[in-house]
UniProtKB/Swiss-Prot annotation:
InterPro entries: Ribosomal_uS11, Ribosomal_uS11_bac-type, Ribosomal_uS11_CS, Ribosomal_uS11_sf. The lineage of its organism: Bacteria, Pseudomonadati, Pseudomonadota, Gammaproteobacteria, Pasteurellales. Belongs to the universal ribosomal protein uS11 family. Part of the 30S ribosomal subunit. Interacts with proteins S7 and S18. Binds to IF-3. GO terms for molecular function: rRNA binding; structural constituent of ribosome. This is Small ribosomal subunit protein uS11.
Length: 129
């Protein structure tokens, strides 16, 4: 008995004009996520996933490469305007925004959403190196 060939459905690329760029910059890594206005993730990239390991993962250049990788993926969606949300104290904060600007996106506003405790949990002890 011959099997009928199963056709794969063509995925319809949704067109998104406005998006939100979430940058989570920690001391060890930088995570870049691009979402639409509703918060649905379109693309994401990390400094570690971009081929950087160890101490090189926490550099501004690694964050820039991650931002460029994410920008390439999102170009297919027709994204033009971006709102940037930056979280964390890491070294990749500014370089990711510069990489976005160089990729040709129009940045509408930049917001710092770093969580600041109102005297919550006790912070870790200071490092003695």
């Amino acid at each position: 008995m011959a099997k009928t060939p199963v056709r794969a459905r063509k995925r319809v690329k949704k067109q998104v004009v406005d998006g939100v760029r979430h940058i989570h910059a920690s001391f060890n890594n930088t995570i870049v996520t691009i979402t639409d206005r509703q918060g649905n993730a379109l693309a994401w990239a990390t400094a570690g996933g971009s081929g950087f390991r160890g101490s090189r993962k926490s550099t501004p250049f690694a964050a820039q490469v991650a931002a460029e990788r994410c920008a390439e993926i999102v170009k297919e969606f027709g994204l033009k305007n971006l709102e940037v949300m930056v979280k964390g104290p890491g070294p990749g904060r500014e370089s990711t925004i510069r990489a976005l600007n160089a990729a040709g996106f129009r940045i509408t506003n930049i917001t710092d959403v770093t969580p600041i405790p109102h005297n919550g949990c006790r912070p870790p002890k200071k490092r003695r190196v």
